[in-house]
C-alpha cells in the first residue's frame, strides 16, 4: 500500500526530528481529499467518470501537484502523492503546500476531442470547489497528461473566472504558445541530471558509498521511461 509505505518512512524520519508526537501526526495527516463523479455524453451515451483531488497541507499556498489520468489511480494513491509534494517542497524551501489529482481513465481509449470534453468537465468540477486556482491550488502534468491537457484546463478556468488577471497561472506545464515556459517539459529530468552531477562532485558523499568520480565506469538502472526518464536518459 503506497500510502501506508509513505507514512511508514515519514514516521521513521520524524523520530529523529525532535518534534512532538501530536505535531508529527498532524504533519502526516492529509487535510482533505475530494471525490468527484461526473457524466459526459460520448458516443451516444453518458459515461460516468471518477476523480480525486487531495490537499495534504495548506501551510503554504497555493498548494501544488500534478493531475494524472490512469486507470490504476485511486484516492489513497492521490493522498500519498499529495503528501510527497508537501515534503519535497518543504525540504528545499519551495513555498507551496502539497496537492495531487487523479482521474480514473485510460486516455488511449478516447479520441482527442473526447478526451478534451472529459478533461474540461473534470476541470469544471475542481474549479468550482477552488481545487484549481492560481492562489490556492495549481496542478501540473503527470502520468497520462501533458501540456495539451493543461491548456484545456487553463482555458476552462478563464471561462469560469474571466476577471482573474492571473488566470493562466491556474496550472503549470502549459505549452509555450499558451503562456507556458520554454524548457518546462524536460525540467524534471534535467533536475535529476544536475543532482547526479553534483553528487559525483562531492568527495564526502562518494566516500560514504564507496564510489569514485569516474562516470565512464558507471552503469545505472532507469525505472520507467516517462517524461522524467526520457529526458534524463
Annotated model-derived regions:
Residues 9-16, 26, 81, 125, ...:
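Residues that form generic nucleotide/phosphate-binding pockets
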Residues 70, 89-216:
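Glycine/serine-rich phosphate-binding loop and adjoining beta1-alpha1 elements at the start
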Residues 25, 35-107:
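Glycine-rich, N-terminal phosphate-binding loop and its surrounding beta-alpha-beta segment
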Residues 218-220:
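Conserved hydrophobic helix-helix packing surfaces used for dimerization/oligomerization
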Residues 224-225:
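Glycine-rich Rossmann-fold phosphate-binding loop(s) that bind the pyrophosphate
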Amino acid at each position: 500500500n503506497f500510502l501506508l509505505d509513505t507514512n511508514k518512512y515519514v514516521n521513521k524520519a520524524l523520530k529523529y526530528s525532535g518534534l512532538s508526537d501530536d505535531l508529527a501526526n498532524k504533519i502526516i495527516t492529509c487535510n482533505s481529499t475530494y471525490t468527484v463523479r461526473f457524466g459526459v455524453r460520448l458516443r451516444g451515451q453518458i459515461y460516468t467518470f471518477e476523480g480525486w483531488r487531495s490537499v495534504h497541507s495548506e501551510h503554504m499556498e497555493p498548494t501544488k501537484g500534478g493531475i494524472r489520468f490512469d486507470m490504476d489511480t485511486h484516492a489513497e494513491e492521490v493522498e500519498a502523492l499529495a503528501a510527497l509534494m508537501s515534503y519535497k517542497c518543504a525540504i528545499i524551501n519551495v513555498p507551496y503546500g502539497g496537492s495531487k489529482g487523479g482521474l480514473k481513465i485510460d486516455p488511449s481509449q478516447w479520441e482527442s476531442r473526447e478526451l478534451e470534453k472529459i478533461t474540461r468537465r473534470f476541470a469544471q468540477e475542481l474549479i468550482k470547489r477552488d481545487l484549481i486556482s492560481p492562489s490556492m491550488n495549481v496542478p501540473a502534468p503527470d502520468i497520462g497528461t501533458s501540456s495539451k491537457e493543461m491548456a484545456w484546463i487553463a482555458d476552462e478556468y478563464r471561462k469560469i473566472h474571466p476577471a482573474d488577471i492571473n488566470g493562466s497561472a491556474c496550472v503549470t506545464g502549459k505549452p509555450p504558445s499558451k503562456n507556458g515556459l520554454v524548457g518546462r517539459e524536460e525540467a524534471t529530468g534535467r533536475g535529476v541530471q544536475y543532482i547526479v552531477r553534483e553528487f559525483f562532485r562531492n568527495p564526502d558523499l562518494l566516500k560514504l558509498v564507496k564510489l569514485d568520480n569516474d562516470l565512464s565506469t558507471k552503469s545505472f538502472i532507469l525505472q520507467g521511461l516517462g517524461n522524467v526518464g526520457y529526458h534524463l536518459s
